[in-house]
Structures are given as C-alpha cells and as structure tokens.
Amino acid sequence: MMSKIKIIQADSPAFIDQVFAIRTEVFVHEQKCLPSEEFDELDAVAQHYLLFENELAVATGRFRKTDKGIKIERIATLSQYRGKGYATELLHHLMEVAQTTYKEANCFYLHAQVSVKPLYEKLGFISYGNTFMEADIVHQAMEKSINA
C-alpha cells in the first residue's frame, strides 16, 4: 500500500506536542542531547511543521527569519521512517513556505550534523567555516542562496 504523505504547519498545541515528541525521541533519547539544549526560547517564534505518513507524525522541522536570512532548524525524522526521503520532502516544503513568507530574504542557512551533510548538499547547501560542536555533536554551517 502506498503511504499517504502530508505536511502541515504545527499551529495548535496538539500539533506542537507532536513536534516536541519527535524531537524528544530523536534528539534527547537517541542522540542524548539535554532537553535544556533541545528546547529553547526560539520555539515560541519559529514556524514548526510536521510531516505525516498516513495519519502518523514522523518528521518535523522549523524555520525562522533572522538578520542573516532564514534559518532552518530541528529537522528530525523518527528512526524507523528514515531513508524514505521524508526529510528532503519536508525541507523542500519549509524552503518554499519560507521563501513565500519572507520574500526579502536572500539565503537559507543551517547548522547540519556532519553525518547528514549529504542530505543538505543534495538540496544545494554549501558548507562554510570550520566544523564545530553543538550539543556534543559535530556540526557544519551551511547556506544556500535563495536566488541561485
């Protein structure tokens, strides 16, 4: 049976609970990040999205406007749903919505875990600067011009 995929903005408390549940599973339990590092004051200002397979929320991500451009953050897919292209689909959606919402922005940027850098490279993101530690995980700063 084909999986039915849908992406929605997590704009209700119930949806935000699902966002936080996915992030808790992936970042806190699986990757051992501290909850105090994973959940921050930016959750209140970012736009959050959920990707559903059939009726189950399996991936999430957020973006927000900054002085530099549009920062994409907290991309997470539940482990048993990885490898299906869901993060790619979610990222395409986030970039499309963000670009429409913030027409004046000229770049997307993010801090990629080095292990998933190829995902972002496939989407046209380019590394810059040295790798660095964030929540005890090696990260690489990456950006993509919106007009490229």
Model-derived features: positions:
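A conserved beta-turn-beta hairpin within the catalytic core of GNAT-like acetyltransferases
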Residues: 65-73, 82, 104-106, 133-139
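Conserved beta-strand in the GNAT
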Residues: 50, 56-64, 69-76
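N-terminal, polar/charged subdomain of small-to-medium soluble alpha/beta proteins
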Residues: 46, 77-78
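Conserved GNAT acetyl-CoA-binding A-motif
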Residues: 98-112
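Conserved acetyl-CoA pyrophosphate-binding loop and the N-cap/start of the following alpha-helix
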Residues: 81, 85-93
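Short amphipathic alpha-helix that is part of the acyltransferase structural core
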Residues: 2-38, 43, 48
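Conserved catalytic-core motifs of GNAT/GCN5-like acyltransferases
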Residues: 109, 121, 126-141
